Structures are given as C-alpha cells and as structure tokens.
Amino acid sequence: MPTWHYSTDIAEKNPEKTAKAMMWDAPISPKEATELARVIRGMKLTEAKAYLERVIKMEEPVPYRRYHGKVAHKRGLADKHGIPMGRYPVKAAKYFLKLLKNVEANAEFKGLEVEKLKIVHIASHKGMTIKRWMPRAFGRATPEFERRTHLEVIVEEVE
C-alpha cells in the first residue's frame, strides 16, 4: 500500500498555524492545473475562491505562461498579469474550488481564522493516465486517454 506525502514540509515547521488538503486523481488536465496553481499561489484564501468563481462564470481568464501554444489573447490580461494569452479552465477551476473549500474546513476545525489564511503552497502533479481505445474501421483504433492530476494545498494564518 503506497503512502502519500506532500511535496514540501512547510506545514511541519508551524503545524498550529497551517492547514492542508489533498486531492488525488482529479479528472482534469495537468497543464490547466499547473497554470491555475501558478495564478492563485500567494493569494489570500478568500481572494482565491472569489477568483475561481469568476473563472467558472467565464468573467476573468487565467493567464497561460507555460502552455500557451495557439492560445488566444484575452482583453485586459496583459495589463493585470503581463501576459496576453489566457483561457477559461472551468472544469479545473471547479476542482480547485472544491480543494480550497476542503482546506478551509480543515482550517476551521483547527481553530484558524479564515480571513487571515494565505495560500503558501499549492501544487499539481501528473497522475495516472487511463487508456482506452475506440475501435475504428479497417481494424484500426483511436486512443482515448484520460489524464488524472494530483492537487495539494497548504494555507497559513498570517497577521
């Protein structure tokens, strides 16, 4: 049986002021998860949740810094983030919002104030790939691969 660990030891240095949460095998793209994690890293928890709500409503795009090949420019994105390419990863934003609500519940259970929580660590890692093959004509087959992503977040109470 495997054991899962966080990719950092921030929470072990100050366990009474931090809360953490994980999500394994989320059915979202690892590339979209990487871009979303980069944007909300360092935000206050309430700001990050509001930002993800706007992404889900397709009101505010997510800047794509690394995986931006053939990605269209979005109005106002370059002024705010310094990069004009972006998209609206709605499905990934829903899973990130679920993760942030989970870490908020964990923080409340530990007695931390939600308004003072800041995201000090958030990361996404490639998970397993579920491989399926759709039979086609003349004995061929088309791959239908479903990628999974592991997510982790650590929040800390700041003054």
Swiss-Prot record:
<dbReference type="GO" id="GO:0003735">
    <property type="term" value="F:structural constituent of ribosome"/>
</dbReference>
<keyword id="KW-0689">Ribosomal protein</keyword>
<comment type="similarity">
    <text>Belongs to the universal ribosomal protein uL22 family.</text>
</comment>
<dbReference type="Pfam" id="PF00237">
    <property type="entry name" value="Ribosomal_L22"/>
</dbReference>
<keyword id="KW-0694">RNA-binding</keyword>
<dbReference type="GO" id="GO:0019843">
    <property type="term" value="F:rRNA binding"/>
</dbReference>
<comment type="subunit">
    <text>Part of the 50S ribosomal subunit.</text>
</comment>
<dbReference type="GO" id="GO:0022625">
    <property type="term" value="C:cytosolic large ribosomal subunit"/>
</dbReference>
<dbReference type="InterPro" id="IPR036394">
    <property type="entry name" value="Ribosomal_uL22_sf"/>
</dbReference>
<dbReference type="InterPro" id="IPR001063">
    <property type="entry name" value="Ribosomal_uL22"/>
</dbReference>
<dbReference type="InterPro" id="IPR005721">
    <property type="entry name" value="Ribosomal_uL22_euk/arc"/>
</dbReference>
<dbReference type="GO" id="GO:0002181">
    <property type="term" value="P:cytoplasmic translation"/>
</dbReference>
<comment type="function">
    <text>The globular domain of the protein is located near the polypeptide exit tunnel on the outside of the subunit, while an extended beta-hairpin is found that lines the wall of the exit tunnel in the center of the 70S ribosome.</text>
</comment>
<dbReference type="InterPro" id="IPR018260">
    <property type="entry name" value="Ribosomal_uL22_CS"/>
</dbReference>
<protein>
    <recommendedName>
        <fullName>Large ribosomal subunit protein uL22</fullName>
    </recommendedName>
</protein>
<keyword id="KW-0687">Ribonucleoprotein</keyword>
<keyword id="KW-0699">rRNA-binding</keyword>
<comment type="function">
    <text>This protein binds specifically to 23S rRNA. It makes multiple contacts with different domains of the 23S rRNA in the assembled 50S subunit and ribosome.</text>
</comment>
